[in-house]
Swiss-Prot record:
GO terms for cellular component: cytoplasm; excinuclease repair complex. The gene is uvrC. Interacts with UvrB in an incision complex. It comes from Trichodesmium erythraeum (strain IMS101). Its main location: cytoplasm. Residues 24-103 form the GIY-YIG domain. Signal peptide: none annotated. This is UvrABC system protein C.
């Protein structure tokens, strides 16, 4: 006999006993339902008081929290030593479990970050849309709303400061043109020490920390010292850096009253699905950064002001956990009251080592600032909504064209690329809800021995790829299974794929079509004639975007493979030089041309290449 577990609010004795077990210390609490699913994860400075507040009679809960309380059957807790530890643990657990009733920040690729790879001796600085958390020392700034402004800023920064320009050196034994024109300090040849280079990068980091004014003051002092020491060339170089930074400062979009207070202003706009949150970073009256976040929360369309404050609190906690103390402002202006404002304020004050204030503005100037941030959030929400509407329209149209039972949530596109059979490859690209999902893209090397230089077979190649893709179809999760696959080609390619899918007994589960290039004709399995469609229909345009992306991805991989083969082709003619040693030589010299110019002694220095083979290689080229 299975005893049904009642919600804890219907068993007052069990509830009271459980509450007594919870200590009055900092920590994290987890609410679970009868299926042992985590409903909500929260934190508190005083665990017992916080958890008890959910069950207090007369407590004015929001609709979301009221729904949650009705489902709670168990409460767990984890004690921490400090509030800061509770904050960090809560963030990690929410990210791991994604509880339904928590505010969830989407790991969105719409907004880019700027990354500084402090984990490397000579850090790189680049723009990325993916926060890689594998290396703890690396630092990410963002996510930035204005991608163009970020790119322009980085471009100007690289003109002002001599920085590493390439992920890998272009030459082994000499510096490239960037060094000759002063754009790079000669990192590849170690013409600058890691310590000296770090000093340059630390100054660049100050720009993205919103400390450009502070950096200009430092450079002014340094310029005066160099001038006093009669180092006029260095002084002139620093002067040019200051001019560049001043022009960067002048390009800021919004100027506010020129006080010396550092402040952040945060506001949001939401619909029934998502909330767009914008955070303006203002330093010395200048808007130095505009960050964007996407949040999800149940019943957002009917959210009250209290719920809006919950979203703002979640964003601020997530953001300030990953920034350095110098980036924390002394003022944080918020659109709505935060539910745990004191908790966040105390933690930020402790982290910064200086008092931090969080408040809803009452005076006209700061209230207008929040209104401006809110309007920007509304514009961004409208932009995303229009994009979503266009994609939904395209998926709806495509479902009607192909007579699909549901909208195609996941669509996969396949293409083949080769030159007369040589270096034959295939690509798979994936669109989810009408947008590219690049984390699911795949390359395939064609393994069919019949496909080789001078002997191409697109039908067999496509059949091979589809067979490999769906080899373990039954073991795949629902989210990995496509609603529709599109083959780049005509009736021939489609027939080859259909034969494979019938053999694998999946043709009834996965819809497949092909899209021919010349007339943008859509072919269905078993049909000799293409569908009658208009090339300008939204659904057809979606298939075209998918086809073009699959083609681009396949061609780029084919070119890479062909380039690698051409590099190795001359080395293949040298007796005794196998693939492994070819890789060692190319890894050491980076190109066949440099191998050709190397002396016997230089060739012999390569691991696995002795004096005898080095002489053979030298003799071959000479």
């Amino acid at each position: 006999m299975i005893t049904q577990i009642l919600p804890i609010i219907k068993d007052s004795e069990r509830l009271e006993n459980r509450l007594k077990e919870i200590p009055q210390t900092p920590g994290v609490y987890l609410m679970r339902d009868r299926s042992d699913r985590i409903l909500y994860i929260g934190k508190s400075k005083k665990l017992r008081n916080r958890v008890r507040s959910y069950f207090r009679d007369g407590k004015n809960h929001t609709h979301r929290i009221s729904l949650m309380i009705q489902q709670i059957v168990e409460i767990e807790f984890i004690v921490t030593d400090t509030e800061a530890e509770a904050l960090a643990l809560e963030a990690n657990l929410v990210k791991q479990h994604q509880p339904y009733f928590n505010v969830l920040l989407k790991d969105d690729k719409k907004y880019p970050y700027l990354c500084i790879t402090w984990s490397e001796d000579y850090p790189r600085i680049f723009i990325t849309r993916k926060r890689r958390l594998g290396k703890a020392k690396d630092r990410y700034y963002g996510p930035y709303v204005d991608t163009r402004l970020l790119r322009n800023t980085l471009h100007l920064v690289k003109r002002i400061f001599p920085l590493r320009q390439r992920p890998k050196p272009l030459f082994k034994d000499r510096s490239c043109l960037n060094y000759d024109i002063g754009r790079c300090p000669g990192v590849c040849q170690e013409l600058i020490t890691p310590e000296e280079y770090h000093k340059i990068v630390q100054r660049v980091a100050m720009i993205f920390q919103g400390r450009t004014g502070e950096l200009i003051d430092i450079l002014n002092t340094q310029m005066e010292k160099e001038a006093e020491a009669l180092n006029f060339e260095k002084a002139a170089f620093i002067r040019d850096q200051i001019r560049g930074l001043n022009s960067l400062n002048a390009d800021q979009k919004v100027s506010l009253p020129d006080d010396r207070v550092s402040r952040d202003a945060i506001a949001l706009a939401g619909n029934h699905q998502i909330a767009c949150v914008q955070l303006f970073q203002i330093r010395a009256g200048k808007l130095v950064g505009r960050l964007g976040f996407i949040a999800e929360i149940p019943d957002l369309g009917t959210a009250e002001n209290q719920e809006l404050g919950v979203i703002l609190q979640r964003v601020l906690e997530s953001h300030y956990q990953i920034v350095e103390s110098v980036e924390i402002p002394t003022e944080i202006i918020v659109q709505n009251e935060l539910p745990e404002s004191n908790f966040l304020q105390n933690w930020l004050t402790e982290k910064k080592g200086k008092k931090v204030e969080i408040f809803v503005p009452q005076r006209q100037g700061k209230a207008e600032l929040i209104e401006m941030v809110k309007k920007n959030a509304e514009y961004e929400l409208l932009r995303l909504a229009k994009m979503s509407d266009r994609n939904n329209e395209a998926m709806t149209d495509l479902a009607e064209i192909l007579d699909l039972p549901e909208l195609p949530h996941r669509i996969e596109g396949y293409d083949i690329s080769h030159i007369q059979g040589s270096d034959a490859v295939a690509s798979r690209v994936v669109f989810i809800d009408g947008l590219p999902a690049k984390q699911h893209y795949r390359h395939y090397k064609i393994k069919n021995p019949e496909v080789r230089s001078g002997h191409s077979d697109d039908f067999a190649s496509m059949a091979e790829v589809i067979g490999r893709r769906f080899r373990d179809y039954e073991k795949q999760t629902t989210t990995d299974k496509p609603d529709l696959i599109m083959i780049d080609g005509g009736k021939g390619q489609l027939s080859a794929v259909v034969a494979v899918m019938e053999e694998m007994n999946i043709l009834e589960e996965v819809r497949v079509v092909s899209l021919a290039k010349q007339r943008e004709e859509i072919f269905l399995p078993g049909e000799s004639e293409p569908l009658r469609t208009d090339a300008e229909q939204p659904g057809v345009q979606l298939l075209r975007r998918l086809r073009d992306e699959a083609h681009r991805f396949a061609v780029s991989f084919h070119r890479d493979r062909r380039s690698q083969r051409m590099k190795r082709s001359r080395l293949d003619e040298i007796p005794g030089l196998g693939q492994h040693r070819q890789k060692l030589l190319l890894g050491h010299f980076h190109s066949v041309d440099y191998i050709r110019m190397a002396t016997v002694e230089q060739l012999a220095e390569v691991s696995g290449v002795g004096p005898k083979l080095a002489q053979q290689i030298y003799d071959y080229f000479h």
